[in-house]
């Protein structure tokens, strides 16, 4: 997924530059690093861990901590990427490409989840959406001729929530996993040795 989002980010940078939006090479590299590392704080089972094993810390906060640790090892080479990730950089559209209503993360995971679940209604034209993006007053905007593509994106996202993310089987499996992890956490805190597969 991170590589897919990275690819879409590269496409978005190329498209925005072709419309006369000036993006320094250092900014392009930084926003690509930010999208590549945006989910580094996700553990296995995605958001389930946020509600069980790790309490009170979001995966975004963990991602930021890990990015800062990597940045220290790289002697500050991720400074700009971290600024963009934290929305502290003046060109707000760069952050919006990483984390916004039409970010490269969402464009990738919707297409990817649609493909792997077989729910064709979730399929979106990410290439078309990227081509319709532009920048106005340092914020991401959509050209008027792209409105239909955005409506399709929003509809597809809603359908994916109804048919996949909030499907009764998905919700039941998530609840079972949460119960299992909470029980394992409880037993481990009591000193009970738990079997874990070496795989």
Give the positions of each predicted feature.
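Active-site rim/loop-helix segments in enzyme catalytic domains that contact anionic ligands
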Residues: 39
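Histidine-centered, transition-metal-coordinating active-site segments
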Residues: 1-30, 42-199
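Short alpha-helical catalytic segment bearing the HExxH-like zincin motif
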Residues: 31-36
């Amino acid at each position: 997924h991170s590589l897919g989002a990275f690819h879409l980010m590269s496409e978005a940078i190329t498209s925005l530059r072709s419309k006369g939006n000036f993006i320094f090479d250092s900014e392009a590299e930084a926003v690509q690093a930010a999208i590549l590392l945006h989910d580094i704080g996700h553990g296995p089972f995605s958001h389930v861990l946020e509600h069980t094993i790790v309490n009170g810390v979001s995966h975004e906060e963990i991602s930021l901590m890990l990015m800062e640790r990597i940045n220290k090892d790289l002697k500050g080479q991720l400074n700009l990427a971290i600024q963009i990730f934290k929305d502290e950089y003046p060109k707000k559209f760069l952050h919006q490409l990483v984390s916004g209503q039409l970010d490269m993360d969402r464009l990738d995971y919707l297409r990817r989840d649609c493909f792997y679940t077989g729910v064709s209604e979730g399929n979106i034209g990410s290439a078309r959406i990227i081509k319709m993006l532009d920048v106005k007053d340092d914020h991401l905007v959509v050209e008027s001729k792209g409105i239909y593509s955005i409506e399709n994106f929003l509809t597809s996202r809603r359908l994916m929530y109804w048919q996949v993310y909030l499907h009764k089987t998905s919700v039941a499996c998530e609840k079972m996993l949460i119960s299992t992890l909470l029980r394992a956490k409880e037993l481990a805190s009591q000193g009970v040795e738990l079997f874990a597969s070496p795989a």
